[in-house]
UniProtKB/Swiss-Prot annotation:
Residues 65-143 are annotated as: Domain II. Its main location: cytoplasm. It is found in: Cytoplasm. It holds the Pfam family HHH_5. The keyword Nuclease does not apply. Residues 144-154 are annotated as: Flexible linker. HAMAP family: DNA_HJ_migration_RuvA (MF_00031). It comes from Acidiphilium cryptum (strain JF-5). Has three domains with a flexible linker between the domains II and III and assumes an 'L' shape. Domain III is highly mobile and contacts RuvB. This is Holliday junction branch migration complex subunit RuvA. The gene is ruvA. Residues 154-204 are annotated as: Domain III. SMART domains: HhH1 (SM00278). GO terms for molecular function: ATP binding; four-way junction DNA binding; four-way junction helicase activity. Keywords: Cytoplasm, DNA damage, DNA recombination, DNA repair, DNA-binding.
Length: 204
């Protein structure tokens, strides 16, 4: 699994860029915000990366910072929000504005993103409003009186979860399996131990 690319930005096109790393060119799909933050080619560039593995393709999604990457991960847990729609949302609204729109139930702002209609905007607001406090820039936008959300997996657990989701497992199932593995193995369990244990449980 690729987590970061450091190389030369050779091309920047609509919705994607080409990063050369030691002679290998990686096509990376990005939000308009991340693409705008890249230097004019050819120039050194670094992107955080989420890897999506399917039977017919391996797709890379790049982010200029961890906040945008974490929001991409969160958005793609919502039914109806695939990678393309998540990037559209992050192109239309950077993380702080997206958090503000969700907290304020501002469907109009959210539907500015291509592919997001009123029903999907309502679902995003309903399912994410109490979860954004755990996200970068999110804590300032939580309405008073809401219950604190459960923090998402961090560190090695988050990396293991991302690996299992990229292999095609549903996020909720993968998270439950990894929680059980960590409970047995302890907080010091290595990343490969978490992944192998999660795979064993998911294969049952």
């Amino acid at each position: 699994m690729i987590g970061r690319l450091c190389g030369t930005a050779e091309q920047i096109e609509d919705g994607r860029c080409l990063i050369d790393v030691s002679g290998v060119g990686y096509v990376v799909f990005c939000s308009a915000r991340s693409l705008a933050a890249l230097p004019a080619p050819p120039a050194r560039a670094t992107l955080l990366v989420e890897t999506q593995v399917r039977e017919d393709a391996i797709t890379l999604f790049g982010f200029i910072d961890a906040a945008e990457r974490d929001w991409f991960r969160l958005l793609t847990t919502i039914q109806g929000v695939g990678a393309k729609v998540a990037l559209n949302l992050l192109s239309a609204l950077p993380p702080d504005q997206l958090a503000s729109a969700i907290a304020a139930s501002d469907r109009g702002a959210i539907t500015r993103a291509p592919g997001v209609g009123p029903k999907l905007a309502a679902r995003l607001i309903s399912e994410l409003r109490e979860r954004i406090a755990a996200m970068p820039t999110g804590s300032a936008f939580i309405p008073t009186g809401t219950a604190p959300p459960v923090a998402p997996p961090q560190g090695k657990l988050a990396d293991a979860l991302s690996a299992l989701v990229n292999l095609g497992y549903r996020r909720a199932e993968a998270e439950a399996a990894l929680s059980a593995v960590q409970a047995e193995a302890g907080e010091d369990a290595a990343l490969d131990e978490l992944i192998r244990g999660g795979l064993r449980r998911l294969a049952r």
